[in-house]
Amino acid sequence: MSTSEVSPAQRVHRLRDRLGGLGFGGDYNPEQWDDATRAEDLRLMREAGVTLVNLAVFGWGRVEPARDAYDFRYFDTVMDDLAAHGIAADLATMTASPPAWLATEHPEMLPVTADGTVLSPGGRQHFCPSSPVYRDRAVKLAEALAAHYADHPALAMWHVGNEYGIHVAECFCDVSAADFRRWLADRYGSVDKLNDAWSTDFWSQRYTGFAQILPPRVAPTYPNPAQQLDFKRFSNDALLTCFRLERDALRRITPDVPVTTNFLAGHKTVDWYAWAPEMDVAALDSYPDPHGPHEHIAAAIAYDALRGATGGAPWLLTEQAPSAVNWRARNAGKAPGRMRLWSWQAVAQGADAVMYFQWRQSRGGAEKFHSGMVPHAGADSRVYREVRALGRELARVPELAGTESSNDVAVLFDWNAWWALELDSHPSDAVRALERLFDHYAPLFDLGVGVDVVHPSADLTGYRLVVLPSLYLLSEDHAARIADFVAAGGTLLASFFTGIVDEHDRVHLGGYPGPLRDVLGIRVEEFWPAADGEPVPLRAAPGGPEPAEPGSLWREDVGLAGAVPELLFTGPDWDDRPAATVHAHGRGTARYVATRPDPAAMRDLTRRALADAGVDPVLPGLPPGVQAVVRRGDGYDVLIVLNHTEEPVTVTLPAERRDLLAADRPLVAGLTLEPRGVAVLGTTGMAADR
């Protein structure tokens, strides 16, 4: 069967049928252990309900100990054992960490930093993404693996690379420089168009030929910001090319096997919105910090962003920690019940698999203190008992696999805007993309509203409220789409430093926020960022919410051009200047926030925007800290309620539902959730028992 005859949806459907419900498992690294331990692993996996493992992520050195000398015997045994125990393999192409012999034979493939430092092997990801040597050897290995395991009964999915770009996202070597020049020539066509896009007449940076252009290496002062931005785009594309080359090799030989790779939440190096459409199913590694009081909200943002990147399709949680990680300054374990809670949160927000790094905690190596499903203490441990209980629980709700969510609120996010916002030479380096995203997402989460985090090019017609969290880079085309959305009756909530530059980091002239001025009914002349720790005093305008605390981070000189103020700045030089505004545009409403209000005030402003849009919470009347999400199937839906607090809570349902985690799935009209508790509630028409 040719690749063109099998669609991504068909590949994923086959995977879902193979797993029989939600996937459960983790990274399996049997090469670290002896035969007796491997035998125990298989027994414990069956006991815990493991259905899927990520296999051989770092196996290149074992299967190709010398050039073209492939030796699959070890993993043949492992694959045979997995198949015999009914466990599917997400088999890695093993290309995340090239073997020592390859780096020794081809030192030119090693990555180079902006200051010219060559990064040595000894860690992982020690390759230049543009290296023809690396790409050639990676594709050859992928082809050899596909040919060898094409018909193996354990093979369920291919896992290409691993967490692309988290250690080496950019390479500044001469090979990358030549590849960058080719990329620029394809993008711009002529050096004159590049000069215009990069504003090279500033500081006499004009080029007369592409051969003169280098990556933004260390320079006497700030490199050209448009050059930096394009180099980030190029670097993203170079890594994506590596993925595509391996994916295409796999599909030529195993066209019906789905292909994925895994993102790492919180990293800005690869653009999820560009990568996810290239995969059959997207995957994410998520490591919330148990020390953080709002980590469940940060995780929720990542899950909604990945679902936005997939167009609403389910995704796979390929890694999380059973308890502690090893790479923070202070590595807290997860309190009893938290691993279960955070796993179900991922499922609620679209995950069709719950997996961990890793199955058995390593005895040696850099990650030996990263927890495992089977920890150093062995199976007689709290962590393993919680893992086993969760595996059995997930197996009770196979109907969740393949279900999707739909929401009325879209938060717009763009990796290009993230990259551009955090370049140098801005009014304030304290304005950070993820923090601004959190500031807008958190009140929506607190108010119980479902959210999609989508790219500005997404179709907005199905949404009622669109949020722009300091979306610094905004093209004229995307701005026009937003304006049309509001004019047609939608509600917009935008915050400061939005719509400032175009896709080439050139300022939209005529006053800020550029192409959104008319929609918002304002015109900003100047930015006045606050100093570190400096309060920004605020008060309510007539009819506006009264802030309990000062704002922070930012203020700007907002001129009204049809908008009405809701918050006002106070204090010397700022008394009664607008700090938050509302404006009627067409049949819709556009709101603007010119500072960072305290969380309560931001929640009040968000509540007003939701009222304008007619958006209700998923489950009205929820106590603070309780999350509710609905996943919808064919003729049924499942409501998942998560108690992120340390207190028991009582939840009343608007109609009876089936408690899908309880024996015989009884009907319930309400429930009490223990601290860190979870409820999974189906519609009454679902089967009464499993």
Language-model features: locations:
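The substrate-binding groove and active-site-proximal loops of carbohydrate-active enzymes
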Residues: 23-33, 56-73, 120-139, 164-168, ...
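Short, acidic/polar
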Residues: 33-47, 138-144, 264-275, 335-343
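Short, well-ordered coil/turn segments that N-cap beta-strands
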Residues: 20-22, 49-51, 83-89, 151-156, ...
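N-terminal carbohydrate-binding accessory modules
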Residues: 1-54, 65, 80-81, 88, ...
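Carbohydrate-binding surfaces of carbohydrate-active enzymes
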Residues: 210-213, 265, 276, 287-690
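Polysaccharide-binding and catalytic clefts of secreted carbohydrate-active enzymes
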Residues: 116-281, 285-299
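Conserved, mostly hydrophobic/aromatic
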Residues: 26, 45, 53, 82, ...
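Aromatic-lined substrate-binding rim segments of carbohydrate-active enzymes
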Residues: 40-46, 54-118, 246-253
